[in-house]
């Protein structure tokens, strides 16, 4: 009985030290300055360079970028920073 209790407590201790599970998130960004046919490719490439980004779809017509990312590796600031650094400021689409 003592061994069982000790094993159970040890197992619970291991579980409590594991990091929280990451979540896959999708966000649509409104992107400024997209005024030529090459712009969506530059925006997409800048977002794909952010660690944790999985999928990126950019719409020239709608001036948006839809990004799926792992929230344990990337966040909104990293995404908007990447597009801004490429010359295309962005913000969450409302």
Located regions from the model:
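Cleaved targeting-peptide boundary
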Residues: 21-28, 93-94
């Amino acid at each position: 009985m003592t061994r069982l209790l000790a094993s159970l407590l040890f197992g619970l201790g291991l579980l409590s030290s594991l990091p929280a599970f990451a979540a896959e998130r999708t966000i649509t960004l409104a992107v400024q300055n997209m005024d030529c046919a090459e712009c969506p490719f530059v925006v997409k490439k800048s977002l794909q360079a952010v660690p944790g980004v999985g999928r990126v779809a950019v719409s020239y017509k709608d001036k948006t970028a839809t990004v799926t990312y792992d929230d344990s590796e990337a966040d909104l600031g990293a995404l908007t920073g990447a597009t801004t650094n490429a010359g295309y400021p962005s913000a969450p689409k409302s």
